[in-house]
């Protein structure tokens, strides 16, 4: 059960989301997905792993990409995929392809063997070494990568290449 949804929040209230600090792939991709497709006014908090559950309860925030949470890894699926499913976004085939790429970057890439995944993983790792002050800054800087990947995925869907250009 998700703690908060777009439909049940009070008028003007922002959805709060919380995850582990020291972002990499899923903890950048998920906030991008949430802001673009779930709640444009969402707020994000990044805390030590052992504080995610307690801070989520205290703040009334939705935990994601943390051990044991509903919107986390399940089997070989990543948190991005869990959010796509929970918020019924799988009708957007470009998002489905993007989810496969994110999975390939965030996991061992054996579920889909998505060729674009390792490249995204390398880019995400590079952002961690550019000297940003905090996780919010990394997210702000890196979202352009997800905008570009989503545009790529949309083009692949238009061309009928639902598994991307390299498969």
Q: What is each model feature region?
A:
Residues 2-14:
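Short, Lys/Arg-enriched N-terminal segments with co-localized hydrophobic residues
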Residues 3-6, 83, 102:
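Extended hydrophobic/Leu-rich segments
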Residues 12, 22-25:
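Intrinsically disordered, low-complexity regions
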Residues 13-16, 123:
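Glycine-rich, often proline-containing surface loops adjacent to acidic residues and nearby aromatics
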Residues 17-20, 27-91, 95:
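Conserved, aromatic- and glycine-enriched, well-ordered alpha/beta core segments
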Residues 26-27, 139:
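Active-site-proximal structural scaffolding
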Residues 85-167:
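A charged, amphipathic interaction segment
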């Amino acid at each position: 059960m998700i703690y908060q949804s777009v439909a049940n929040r009070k008028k003007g209230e922002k959805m709060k989301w919380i995850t582990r600090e020291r972002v990499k792939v899923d903890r950048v991709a998920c906030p991008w997905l949430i802001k673009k497709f779930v709640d444009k006014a969402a707020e994000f908090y990044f805390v030590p792993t052992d504080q995610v559950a307690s801070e989520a309860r205290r703040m009334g925030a939705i935990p994601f990409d943390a051990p044991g949470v509903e919107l986390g890894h399940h089997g070989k699926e990543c948190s991005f995929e869990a959010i796509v499913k929970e918020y019924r976004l799988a009708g957007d085939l470009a998002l489905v392809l993007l989810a496969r790429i994110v999975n390939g970057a965030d996991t061992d890439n054996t579920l889909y063997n998505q060729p674009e995944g390792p490249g995204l993983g390398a880019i995400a790792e590079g952002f961690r070494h550019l000297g940003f002050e905090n996780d919010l800054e990394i997210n702000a800087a890196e979202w352009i990568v997800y905008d570009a990947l989503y545009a790529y995925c949309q083009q692949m869907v238009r061309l009928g290449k639902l598994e991307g250009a390299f498969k």
